[in-house]
Swiss-Prot record:
Entry function: Assists in the loading of diacylglycerol, generated from triacylglycerol stores in the fat body through the action of adipokinetic hormone, into lipophorin, the hemolymph lipoprotein. It increases the lipid carrying capacity of lipophorin by covering the expanding hydrophobic surface resulting from diacylglycerol uptake. It thus plays a critical role in the transport of lipids during flight in several species of insects.
Coiled coil: none
Protein's recorded name: Apolipophorin-3
Gene Ontology CC terms: extracellular region
Residue spans crossing the bilayer: none
Keyword hit for Transport: yes
Extent of the signal sequence: none
Subunit (UniProt): Equilibrium between a soluble monomer and a bound lipoprotein form. Apolipophorin-3 associates with lipophorin during lipid loading until each particle contains 9 or 14 molecules of apolipophorin-3.
A biological process from GO: lipid transport
Record key words, sorted: Lipid transport, Secreted, Transport
Subcellular location: Secreted
Organism: Melanoplus sanguinipes
Expressed in which tissues: Hemolymph.
Length: 23
């Protein structure tokens, strides 16, 4: 589904943000 693409991108962004705060 195309709707899963932006959802996945958002999840990746959130993960990166979490890693940045943890660093």
């Amino acid at each position: 589904d195309a709707a899963q693409v932006p959802d996945f991108a958002t999840a990746v962004q959130n993960l990166x943000h979490t890693l940045s705060e943890a660093a």
